[in-house]
């Protein structure tokens, strides 16, 4: 009897398996690539639930060698957005089968399949071209309607930043004439015409003057902390030049120039000593220091519904190394200065586009707008997206405007691959992992969100 029951269960299971195979084999014809992918995932989930229901109650759940549940046996009690290592392996295999050519994605609404005659090669190429142009047109429409900032808004925001920079420069020279500073200057995506959606932030770089014989920079990877992309600024020759020989000795902590202490020094000036309401009235702006934790940020209301945030960013230059006081996400690294790569990255991107009238910057701005408008992608930074484009530019030579859709899809696929590996090397300094400050959970959520949209990228344009 037991044997008969076992055979019966096996027969039933084979029947369900046959039905599932039939549904999946015909799903793509009816639903297209995106629909087939989603149906496959849902069908697999139902089959797993059925398998568990008919299995013995005491049978243990199969675990992977690492002790975690595998992609084949998902943890139903966990978050669907957190992918363990085995699930990432399955994700990698799945990526190999997904299409990357924009012509693969049918943007038309669903209609019943009809018998079609065998098309000639020219007709097939024409259809692919039309589908590619459909995605291309949607990307361009998204850029015009959602990503691009009106020229007038950009000009007014830049003028507000210039006015405040001039006032701050005059105040520091008058009140702190002994503070060794070079001329402040504006930087950031708004200044470089790479900002999207709204003109709402810019950086004010404040260069400190350091004596070259009293200070040196030590790469983070050469320290016990082993943090590439960050530096320690060490005070040198204290036996010959005692404390007080440099103005910035007051900001030394444990023998190193502390970016946190430097930032605190400027915070007292920016937030505590300057009468911003009076300056705002003079300039016809509403100016106030941003609340914590944005200690070195000014919020400027330059129109009724327009706000600009100005980040006050101290900077030091030693030799060819430019560092900024932008802290690491982890508090234990608050004594480290961040290596400034953004100016060089932007210059390379601009040079590449100027050389061939390419669409690299346009593709980057569309990606930035998507991430800015999609909360689940909010952890991706402009620097990370810029480096994805720079890496892709090394692989692909043709960046003519009509290739925008193809390059956009390749950038999405490349970004998912970097997230899967947990490593995005800097295009200018490969030792620097631009994902190093993301947590595993953040990386998994980003990868999950992008992977789910890869079969139907138009979804990203609807946020």
From Swiss-Prot:
Its main location: mitochondrion. It is a single-pass membrane protein. This is Mitochondrial dynamics protein MIEF1. Residues 49-195 are annotated as: Dimerization. The chain crosses the membrane at residues 24-46. Belongs to the SMCR7 family. The keyword Membrane applies. It comes from Homo sapiens. Expression is relatively high in heart, skeletal muscle, pancreas and kidney. Residues 100-110 have a biased composition (Low complexity). Residues 57-77, 96-123 are annotated as: Disordered. The lineage of its organism: Eukaryota, Metazoa, Chordata, Craniata, Vertebrata. Changing residue 235 to A: No effect on mitochondrial localization. Impairs DNM1L recruitment. Keywords: Membrane, Mitochondrion, Mitochondrion outer membrane, Nucleotide-binding, Phosphoprotein, Transmembrane, Transmembrane helix. Residues 160-169, 234-242 are annotated as: Important for interaction with DNM1L.
């Amino acid at each position: 009897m037991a044997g008969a029951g076992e055979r019966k269960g096996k027969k039933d299971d084979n029947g369900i398996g046959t039905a599932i195979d039939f549904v999946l084999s015909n799903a793509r014809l009816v639903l297209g690539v995106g629909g087939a992918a989603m149906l496959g995932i849902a069908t697999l989930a139902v089959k797993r639930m059925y398998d568990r229901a008919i299995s013995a109650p005491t049978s243990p759940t199969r675990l992977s060698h690492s002790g975690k549940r595998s992609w084949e046996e998902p943890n139903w009690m966990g978050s669907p957005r957190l992918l363990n290592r085995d699930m990432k392996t399955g994700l990698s295999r799945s990526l190999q089968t997904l299409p990357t050519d924009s012509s693969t994605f049918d943007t038309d609404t669903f209609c019943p399949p009809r018998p079609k005659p065998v098309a000639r090669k020219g007709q097939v190429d024409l259809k692919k071209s039309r589908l590619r142009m459909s995605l291309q047109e949607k990307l361009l429409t998204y850029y015009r309607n959602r990503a691009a900032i009106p020229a007038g808004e950009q000009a007014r925001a830049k003028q507000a930043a210039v006015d405040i920079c001039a006032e701050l420069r005059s105040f520091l020279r008058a009140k702190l004439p002994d503070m060794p500073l070079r001329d402040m200057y504006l930087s950031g995506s708004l200044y470089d015409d790479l900002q999207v959606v709204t003109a709402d932030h810019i950086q004010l770089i404040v260069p400190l003057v350091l004596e070259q014989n009293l200070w040196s920079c030590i790469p983070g990877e050469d320290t016990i902390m082993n943090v590439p992309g960050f530096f320690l600024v060490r005070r040198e020759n204290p036996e010959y030049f005692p404390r007080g020989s440099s103005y910035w000795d007051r900001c030394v902590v444990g023998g190193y120039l502390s970016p946190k202490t430097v930032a605190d020094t400027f915070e007292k000036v920016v937030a505590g000593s300057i009468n911003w309401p009076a300056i705002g009235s003079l300039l016809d702006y509403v100016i106030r220091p941003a609340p914590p934790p944005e200690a070195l940020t000014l919020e400027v209301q330059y129109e009724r519904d327009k706000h600009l945030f100005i980040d006050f960013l101290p900077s030091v230059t030693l030799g060819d190394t430019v560092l900024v006081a932008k802290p690491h996400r982890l508090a234990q690294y608050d004594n480290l200065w961040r290596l400034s790569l953004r100016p060089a990255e932007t210059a390379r991107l601009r040079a590449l586009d100027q050389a061939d009238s390419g669409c690299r910057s346009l593709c980057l701005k569309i990606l930035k707008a998507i991430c800015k408008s999609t909360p689940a992608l909010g952890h991706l930074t402009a620097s990370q997206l810029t480096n994805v484009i720079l890496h892709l530019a090394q692989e692909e030579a043709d960046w003519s405007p009509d290739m925008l859709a193809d390059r956009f899809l390749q950038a999405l696929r490349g970004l998912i691959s970097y997230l899967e590996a947990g490593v995005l090397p800097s295009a200018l300094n490969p030792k620097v992992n631009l994902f190093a400050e993301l947590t595993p959970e953040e990386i998994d959520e980003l990868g999950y969100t992008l992977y789910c949209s890869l079969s139907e990228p138009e979804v990203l344009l609807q946020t």
